């Protein structure tokens, strides 16, 4: 080691001396060139005979040669400076070999037939119960042309080569406790979720309440829930009108209560909306309108199904008891 250090020291000294000599030669050439150019400029200002002109041409040729030589010297300096600092190496500490037979024999390397690149994937194999060591994930590496390497990073901080061999310990910092939990909702998100719940709650009465609370309704507030209606079975019939009044409609097997009406585009007659009042909570509806082509006919459209029979009217509203009989006085 001492011999190598001395040789390397002598080599560095030789390099520095060579660089200094090349730089000095370049500077001397530049100084000579400047003097030659100054003499040439002085001779050009004063008129000279023919022999003097030949001397000036010779001086120009000498200037070109000096310039080329100076440039070559500086190029040599640059190349020597570029070579310094390279091709150096250090010897690392000698690693003590293990006496175990498993460590002396290297694990076989499986070669892949072609270069197949696999994307990086994260596989969360364990449930995150304690936000700490139980949260495990594996990272799949990119397989090269000669060998494939699979590194798995487990939650306890050990890095293995994926083939069941020895593993080198790598302690990883535990993740923060808030990384696996849900972030707190902002006020806007909370208001939005509350609005969704309100829409879901009052969707069932959207059809009836929108009409009753609208322009022709009796209530003052309008429901702000979704206007989407459920798919209902519709049945349309045509019956003759019993009078010219809009409120007079033909009777059927059920009792109906009017809860709203609205005008029809292109028709002078409005459309009336009725709900079944035979039994409380019955979803059956109907709307009645006059036929624009024949005002003496009514178009009745039924929606929904009754949840009772026509005889339920008497059960929901029992008849009043008969008045007591008057007994004759004796």
Swiss-Prot record:
UniProt cross-references to Pfam families, sorted A to Z: Plant_zn_clust (PF10533), WRKY (PF03106)
Name of this protein: WRKY transcription factor WRKY51
Domain notes: The WRKY domain is required to bind DNA.
The encoding gene: WRKY51
Subcellular location: Nucleus
Residue ranges: DNA binding: 245-311
Motif Nuclear localization signal location, chain numbering: 74-81
Source species: Oryza sativa subsp. indica (Rice)
Signal sequence interval, chain numbering: none
